Amino acid sequence: MTMIKICGLSTPETIEAAVQAGATHVGLVHFAKSPRHVELEKAAELRALVPESVKAVLLLVNEQPEETARAIQIVKPDVVQFHGSETPQWTKAVRDQLGIEVWKALGVREAATLEKSRRYEGAVDRLLFDSPAKKLPGGNGVTFQWDVLAGFEHHTAWGLAGGLTPDNVGDAIRQTGAELVDASSGVESAPGVKDIAKIEAFCEAARNA
């Protein structure tokens, strides 16, 4: 069964909604430029609401080593997701030194981008293929050409992000065979404002794909 991540949650109500709807992962964004940003102390409070059966993912963007370690120490996520220009050396160091599951998001423009993703083999636990970054890394509501994934031999666990909604997630899973799907803006009524009905619809559509 495809795993489901709802990212950019910022209230107890939406955390509960995602869990009840069947999300396997919930994402907390700590990146000041994002409309989904939560301070570390609030992220820790939200993380405490996540049951053991669901994984809490903390999203960071180009943080310094000290801040990364501090964020992980305060929030205590199950997974840290890097969504900036972090190198394989950096992601491997975090995984090895802090003993945490590490994901890396990569913007996909073309098949060549996928080949470049091989640099992260052995340096991350999962790659998240997303739309190319615009003003902000992630959460832009734009899909990419899923057909570039056709025939690509994945050597690392992976997931699909970028403009996924209740209306297109079923097709996305069927076309790509994604192991995990990740929604953020596609389950919002406004930037940073999660819509519980859309969260429920997204999870249902993903389960039924």
UniProtKB/Swiss-Prot annotation:
Transmembrane segments: none annotated. It catalyses: N-(5-phospho-beta-D-ribosyl)anthranilate = 1-(2-carboxyphenylamino)-1-deoxy-D-ribulose 5-phosphate. It comes from the Bacteria. Pathway: Amino-acid biosynthesis; L-tryptophan biosynthesis; L-tryptophan from chorismate: step 3/5. GO terms for biological process: L-tryptophan biosynthetic process. It is an enzyme of class 5 (isomerase). Its EC number is 5.3.1.24. Keywords: Amino-acid biosynthesis, Aromatic amino acid biosynthesis, Isomerase, Tryptophan biosynthesis. One of its GO terms (molecular function) is phosphoribosylanthranilate isomerase activity. Belongs to the TrpF family. This is N-(5'-phosphoribosyl)anthranilate isomerase. It comes from Erythrobacter litoralis (strain HTCC2594).
